[in-house]
Amino acid sequence: MITFFEKLSTFCHNLTPTECKVSVISFFLLAFLLMAHIWLSWFSNNQHCLRTMRHLEKLKIPYEFQYGWLGVKITIKSNVPNDEVTKKVSPIIKGEIEGKEEKKEGKGEIEGKEEKKEGKGEIEGKEEKKEVENGPRK
């Protein structure tokens, strides 16, 4: 009985069945890698757009987004002059603000900070040091 790869080998310019198997497997492997690359680039683009939208919401800049084949498209809608919006938005798009939190206005003191207690600085419940004789090691 003629196998699939034997039939395909005549179609593949008279390759041997083994060579045909290798070429078919490598073709499917390359197709899988290409699809994985496309999916990962689409996913990372969407993650970057979502991060950008969160920053735009913090800055209270109006925007709209659209889903497309290549990811998410963000359009900024603002009555503010372009220069001011560009100054705020360009570091977000470049990824420079990623992971940084906004500073709150104030003296910079931490709320709920306890006052320093006066004392010797010793910890309660601390055990006393025990002296150990240094003898020869066995």
From Swiss-Prot:
InterPro entries on file: DUF809
Positions of transmembrane segments: 19-40
Expressing tissues: Expressed in roots, leaves and flowers.
Keywords linked to the UniProt accession: Membrane, Mitochondrion, Repeat, Transmembrane, Transmembrane helix
Keyword Repeat among UniProt keywords: yes
Protein origin, superkingdom: Eukaryota
Major site of localization recorded for this protein: mitochondrion
Name of this protein: Uncharacterized mitochondrial protein ORF138
Entry annotated with the keyword Repeat: yes
Membrane topology: Single-pass membrane protein
Region Disordered: start-end pairs: 98-138
Further details from the record: Nuclear restoration is accompanied by a dramatic reduction in the amount of this protein in mitochondria of flowers and leaves, but not roots of fertility-restored plants. The restorer genes are affecting either the translation or the stability of the protein.
Any single GO CC term annotated in Swiss-Prot or TrEMBL for this entry: mitochondrial membrane
Ranges occupied by Sequence repeats: 94-106, 107-119, 120-132
Region feature 3 X 13 AA tandem repeats of K-G-E-I-E-G-K-E-E-K-K-E-[GV], mapped onto this chain: 94-132
Function, in words: Involved in cytoplasmic male sterility (CMS) by leading to pollen abortion. Not expressed in fertile (normal) plants.
Cellular compartment(s): Mitochondrion membrane
Pfam families: DUF809
